[in-house]
């Protein structure tokens, strides 16, 4: 597979506490507001680096886990991945400490719940975003089959 790259840009105006910005995907796929006070408080429709990391991790992992299902000749009617990124406020600043992946398989065929749990946890080790984050924070996976 050829090498590829993706980019995003943030336009920021003002100070850290009073300013705002807009994060934009290089592809034009999204343009979202960002603000430091809302990052650490009530978000009120404004995103944060942590939420964007959660979105990237959930998306990448969903692709990896559904690929693993296909290779195992299994499938779902729907696979939902929710990623929750946790950060602590410290004297040194904000530290991202955990990325938790909840994966729910609805209408699973071709394997039982125990096999899905094992496969889902093994798939995490193959997720490029997990691999980029690993070592900097804890990553865990929880599964549910409906």
What are these regions (language model features)?
Residues 1-55, 62-146:
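Extended beta-strand/beta-hairpin segments
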């Amino acid at each position: 597979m050829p090498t590829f790259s993706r980019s995003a840009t943030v336009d920021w105006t003002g100070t850290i506490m009073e300013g705002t910005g807009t994060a934009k995907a290089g592809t034009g796929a999204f343009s979202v507001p960002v603000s430091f006070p809302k990052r650490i408080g009530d978000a009120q429709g404004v995103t944060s680096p942590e939420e964007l990391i959660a979105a990237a991790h959930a998306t990448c992992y969903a692709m990896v886990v559904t690929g693993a299902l296909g290779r195992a000749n299994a499938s779902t009617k729907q696979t939902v991945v929710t990623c929750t990124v946790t950060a602590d406020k410290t004297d040194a600043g904000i530290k991202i400490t955990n990325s938790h992946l909840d994966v729910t398989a609805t209408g699973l065929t071709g394997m039982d719940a125990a096999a899905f749990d094992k496969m889902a946890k093994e798939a995490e080790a193959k997720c490029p975003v997990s691999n980029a984050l690993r070592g900097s924070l804890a990553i865990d996976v929880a599964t549910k089959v409906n």
